[in-house]
Amino acid sequence: MEIVWFKRDLRIIDHAPLFEAVECGAVCPLYIFEPDIWSQPDASRRHYEFLLESLTELDAALSALGQGLIIRVGDAVEVLDTLKAETGFTRLWSHQETGNGWSYARDLAVKEWARANGVSWKERKQHGVMRGTHSRDKWASNWHREMYQPQISPPVQLKPLSLPSRNLPAAADLGLGPDDCPGRQKGGRREAMSLLDGFLTERGQTYRRDMSSPLTGEWTCSRLSPHFSFGTLSIREALQASEARRRAPMEKGWEGSLRAFESRLRWHCHFIQKLEDEPEIEFRNMHAAYDGLREDSFDAARFTAWSEGITGFPFIDACMRSVTATGWLNFRMRAMLMSFASYHLWLHWRETSLHLARLFTDYEPGIHYAQAQMQSGTTGINTMRIYNPVKQSQDQDPDGVFLRKWVPEIAHLPTHLIHTPWAAPDKGQYPDPIINEHRARKIAADRLYSLRKTTTHKRIAGEVVRKHASRAAPPRRHRSSGKETASAQFELDL
């Protein structure tokens, strides 16, 4: 019997482990529900609910082939050990996973168990992230080669099995408390395909122009990111569908928007590659010269104001309240939230990134922690961007539409005052700014720029570049910037 372990790849199409396993014999499609992962500080109920919806559809798709999903609950090694006693399997199939530190440790334990028990664990690449690479040279070319392979068809049928399946624990039994997210995106393959179709036929036309605003980005972005995170849709499927759309007759705007989208699919994998190459960046600074910079100055009151959207800066608060209620925010505004917490409030990126991880339905550890560090200035190799929240508000929401929706306390203010309510004589109950924006920005910039001038910083930065920076541009027909430009940093909107 072949065991296909579904992890964050909840689909039957373009699924190499499933396809290859079926060629070898009867297949047990397995999902191991691991309660311990839900006690980790980056987990939340909105993730759990999206997962359940995706598992329900996966089970239906597999059942239509002849064998539904076998669910087992518990520690992965213990579950596999029990399953081996039941079936005697000698091959385990799965996709490679670049997850959080907990899943990395679990995979190491499974690898050791497989070795000790005569099980061949066959992992296949997903999304174009390269395992075991020691250099970023030719990474873009390799990624394109991988992404332009033909998509893998689902099996024609699966042989029915007599193995028992278990029920999933309830959220409350996992310690997952209430999570008020009325605007959360729904999980499952059908929703992913509907979003992809809507993006490629209607919403994506103004993607390149409108992605930077939280008002327009909500509509024009693909909104596929949680489906990439849980694997209900593959990056290859989205990329090839976008290219096919570009080959068809198009109205003005489509060409540039679809090329921008395709570029961001590559950057999606580029950032996950950073965590694959250096799992420690989830926990420690990418550039060691920043160790100790913020660790001893965490202000709990500032963190609370930031996390609850009551900083006194309307655009910051509107963005935080929006992502809390919907699980999604366009990328520029995510970067602004992180930057404001790290620079203006001088909070360490670890705690603030965990809070955002719990809020983002599309939480992807590889992108998340690399970006958290970029917006906090601790990579040492990227442009230091300290957002002015008032300017961003005026640029991205000039008429105050987004502000009035999410910060109703100031909805009565005229447009010329809504971005700076502290200047209004009747701002009501909305709080005053918790910091002096100009002063806080200057202090943060001075601290980091002085550190960047040191010889030690420059030496370590060279090491970081060699390990993590993008190198060459991709082949000409897929050309986009091979450098980590400021634009690429902030425009991963999917």
Language-model regions, residue ranges each:
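Active-site "lid/cap" and pocket-lining segments within catalytic core domains
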Residues: 1-262, 272, 379-494
